[in-house]
Amino acid sequence: MHFIVVTPQDTQLIEQISSALHHEWRHLPPWENISAIRMRLIERCSHDNPQILSCYADKNGNLLATASTILHELTGVHQATWWLGEVLTVPEARGHKMGSKLIEELYNCYHNLIGQSLYLYTPDMQQLYRRMGWKDVEERIVNHEQVTVMKR
């Protein structure tokens, strides 16, 4: 497994990430259209965009986990410019702390480049993120789900 900052040339990874996000969350509006996901990911990893699309892949280039830093993902959260989002470990790779390791690696990469607070929202992983140093900011509804907004 190795950390990858995805570029537009990583077409196989972009396809795998798009498919994994769509499969996991297709019941929610931002992930119901795989073509829209693909375009969003290509834009996110373009050279003139400060956002980061990252992943872990195995030695054969198969996706294990993905996470991104996203500019302005949610509006209305005071001073929340940068967000950690689209964090997903593929089902076959779960249970090995890959998601947590990827988040830490991406956070360090982001912090070295940008240095501002990073936010996230989660409906059900608050305890995990608290153990990783994230602090609760507020509760709100996002995509028809009750979520906790957190900051680090």
Label the predicted regions.
Residues M1-Q16:
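Conserved N-terminal entry element of GNAT/NAT acetyltransferase domains
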Residues R26-C55, S68:
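Active-site rim helix/loop that mediates acceptor-substrate recognition in acyltransferases
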Residues L53-C55, N62-H72, W83, L88:
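Conserved beta-strand in the GNAT
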Residues H72-L84, R94, L113, N143:
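A conserved beta-turn-beta hairpin within the catalytic core of GNAT-like acetyltransferases
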Residues V87, L118-Y121:
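Conserved hydrophobic beta-strand within the GNAT/NAT acetyltransferase core sheet
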Residues E92-A93, K97-E105:
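Conserved acetyl-CoA pyrophosphate-binding loop and the N-cap/start of the following alpha-helix
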Residues N112-Q116, P123-Q146:
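Conserved active-site alpha-helix within GNAT-family acetyltransferase domains
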